[in-house]
A protein has these predicted regions:
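A conserved acidic beta->alpha catalytic loop
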Residues: 47-56, 101
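Cell-envelope/extracellular polymer assembly enzymes that use nucleotide-activated donors
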Residues: 8-10, 42, 191
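N-proximal low-complexity "stem/linker" segments adjacent to membrane-targeting elements
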Residues: 1-31
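Short beta-strand/loop segment that forms part of the nucleotide-sugar
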Residues: 13, 26, 30, 37-49, ...
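Conserved donor nucleotide-binding strand/loop of the catalytic core
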Residues: 39-44, 55-88
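Acidic helix N-cap motif at the loop->helix transition within catalytic regions
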Residues: 20-24, 52-60
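Acceptor/aglycone-binding surface of glycosyltransferases and processive sugar-polymer synthases
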Residues: 72-88, 93, 105-186
Length: 206
């Protein structure tokens, strides 16, 4: 189990052309951390060669003490952005936070609870298990494709995940650093799941 009082949290925010949301998501992350009394943290932003003004916005907040910002010199994909972040984190637990506001940082306490109360190594925030008051309705073909991909992945890794493609993934950093990630794009999602499952790390969904 992770000691809630002493652990350090790393929040990774890969972004590409998110000028309309990048400051908002950083503000929401900070609000959630303060509300849940997670005071030992770092926010790591990776700008994947944005062309819409995101880079200039990030340069204006480079001096913020709780943020580290890294800039790719060419667009490489989400997987590559996460690989860059992992080389520079210092936290015990890692949250991957998309920059487009689809996933709400107010869920952090729920996502982190298994680390405090069990021996969880990885926690995925599922959009389909319906543990909250309501569940967002998704486009049918995206839902079906995700279900098929998750089902196929479960066969190979002997798990019963409901939402492998979820953007909310939380890891012990020691687990993540024990594997070698090579996928540059959104193929990161199945790659990280399969490689961690093969090492018999303990998965939870919330």
């Amino acid at each position: 189990m992770i000691d809630k009082k002493t652990f350090k949290l790393s929040i990774l925010i890969p972004c590409f052309n998110e000028k309309l949301t990048i400051i908002s998501i950083i503000d929401e992350v900070r609000k959630s951390l303060k509300k849940n009394n997670f005071l030992n943290y770092e926010i790591v932003v990776i700008d994947d060669f944005s062309s819409d003004g995101t880079t200039q916005i990030l340069k204006n907040i480079e001096s913020d003490k709780d943020i580290s910002i890294f800039y790719h010199t060419q667009n490489q994909g989400k997987g590559s952005a996460i690989q860059t972040a992992l080389k520079n984190i210092t936290g015990d637990v890692v949250i991957v936070q998309d920059a487009d506001l689809e996933y709400d940082p107010s869920d952090y306490n729920k996502l982190l609870l298994p680390f405090f109360e069990t021996n969880a190594d990885i926690v995925y925030g599922s959009r389909f298990i319906g543990g909250g008051k309501y569940v967002r309705i998704h486009f049918f073909w995206h839902y079906l494709a995700n279900k098929i991909l998750t089902f196929i992945c479960n066969i190979f890794i002997n798990l019963n995940l409901t939402d492998m493609e979820t953007g909310y993934k939380v890891f012990k950093s020691s687990a993540l650093k024990s594997i070698t990630l090579i996928e540059k794009s959104f193929s990161f999602e199945p790659e990280v799941t399969i490689k961690l499952a093969k090492k018999k790390f303990k998965f939870f969904e919330v």
